[in-house]
């Protein structure tokens, strides 16, 4: 068989369809040639005046478009600049701290202690913005100013009722049972009644100390410093016990005097502080011995003379 018959393949299209395609191609070529010739004829028929007018109109329209675009672009540029500035300010506020890394090469100074570490550099803009924000947050001039909690208090106020008396040292240990700020506000009388049994123990301690100090063998064994400390302790214990007894006596005197005054009265009468002092002095003076009265009178006379002596004119120079 020849080569021609080997390469033959069956076709699905009929001969009529192929003929129709060829006709359509020829018609489309014809119409395209006619359109080109018509456009050439139209351009050739136009005059030079019409072409000039058309060019002028096109130039005017292009100028107007340029002017309008420039006017519109100015506010757009301003808005763009403002938006960029705002973005930069926000970025600076968010950047609280920036870090710079030191060089690790051979040229770096070996004497620097911070070699290989990051140095913190506070941004100036961030500090300015924070100060401005702090100023804006303060509403009025009479508003309270903000202060750090680490700052010490300038003045410690004394609360009435919680002050330590002059006789007590503030640095000494204070019993919480008698502290007004921690316990109930109770009278001295109730506390004294509750702990009056301690007087017996105090008296025993005083007698024991006095017995040891009177013993010569014991005194020779200890040093002079220890002996002086024991003597001071003995005197302080005796004075404390005596003050407690004097307070009990004063309270008893006033109680008896008020009961005598308010026997037949429905409304109770309470003495003033000055009257209480006078009643106590009168009772003690009446119940003193003759020698004790003389000593008290001499002490008062010296006190009065000292006051009068200070009032003389030569002391005021």
UniProtKB/Swiss-Prot annotation:
Record field: compositional bias (Basic and acidic residues): 54-67, 82-100
Which organism was this protein described from? Answer: Lachancea thermotolerans (strain ATCC 56472 / CBS 6340 / NRRL Y-8284) (Yeast)
Gene that produces this protein = RRP36
Its cellular-component GO annotations read:
90S preribosome; nucleolus
Subunit structure, briefly? Associates with 90S and pre-40S pre-ribosomal particles.
**Residue ranges, annotated region (Disordered):** 1-20, 54-168
What the record says about family reads: Belongs to the RRP36 family.
Q: What is its main location?
A: nucleus
What's the protein called, per UniProt? Answer: rRNA biogenesis protein RRP36
Keywords assigned? Coiled coil, Nucleus, Ribonucleoprotein, Ribosome biogenesis, rRNA processing
Where does the record place Low complexity bias? 101-115
**What the protein does?**
Component of the 90S pre-ribosome involved in the maturation of rRNAs. Required for early cleavages of the pre-RNAs in the 40S ribosomal subunit maturation pathway.
Q: Which residues form a coiled coil?
A: 220-248
Q: Note the InterPro entries from the entry.
A: RRP36 (IPR009292)
- Which Pfam families does its entry note? RRP36 (PF06102)
Question: Where found in the cell?
Answer: Nucleus, Nucleolus
Q: Which GO terms describe its biological process?
A: maturation of SSU-rRNA from tricistronic rRNA transcript (SSU-rRNA, 5.8S rRNA, LSU-rRNA)
């Amino acid at each position: 068989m020849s080569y021609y018959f080997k390469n033959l393949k069956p076709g699905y299209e009929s001969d009529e369809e192929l003929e129709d395609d060829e006709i359509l191609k020829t018609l489309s070529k014809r119409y395209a040639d006619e359109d080109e010739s018509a456009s050439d004829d139209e351009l050739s028929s136009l005059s030079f005046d019409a072409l000039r007018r058309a060019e002028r109109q096109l130039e005017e329209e292009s100028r107007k478009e340029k002017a309008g675009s420039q006017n519109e672009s100015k506010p757009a540029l301003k808005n763009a600049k403002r938006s960029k500035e705002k973005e930069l300010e926000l970025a600076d506020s968010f950047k609280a701290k920036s870090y710079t890394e030191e060089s690790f090469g051979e040229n770096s100074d070996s004497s620097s202690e911070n070699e290989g570490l990051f140095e913190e550099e506070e941004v100036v803009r961030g500090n300015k913005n924070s100060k401005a924000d702090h100023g804006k947050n303060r509403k009025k001039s009479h508003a309270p100013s903000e202060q750090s909690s680490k700052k010490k208090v300038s003045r410690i106020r004394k609360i009435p009722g919680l002050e330590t008396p002059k006789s007590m040292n503030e640095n000494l240990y204070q019993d919480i049972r008698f502290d007004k700020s921690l316990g109930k506000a109770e009278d001295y009388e109730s506390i004294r009644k509750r702990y009056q049994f301690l007087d017996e123990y105090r008296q025993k301690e005083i007698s024991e100390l006095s017995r040891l100090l009177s013993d010569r063998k014991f005194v020779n064994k200890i040093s002079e410093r220890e002996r002086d400390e024991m003597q001071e302790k003995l005197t302080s214990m005796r004075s404390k016990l005596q003050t407690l007894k004097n307070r009990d006596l004063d309270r008893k005197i006033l109680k008896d005097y008020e009961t005598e005054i308010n026997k037949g009265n429905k409304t109770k009468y309470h003495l003033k502080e000055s009257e209480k002092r006078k009643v106590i002095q009168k009772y003690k003076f009446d119940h003193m011995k003759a020698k004790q009265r003389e000593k008290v009178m001499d002490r008062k006379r010296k006190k009065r003379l000292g006051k009068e002596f200070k009032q003389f004119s030569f002391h005021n120079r």
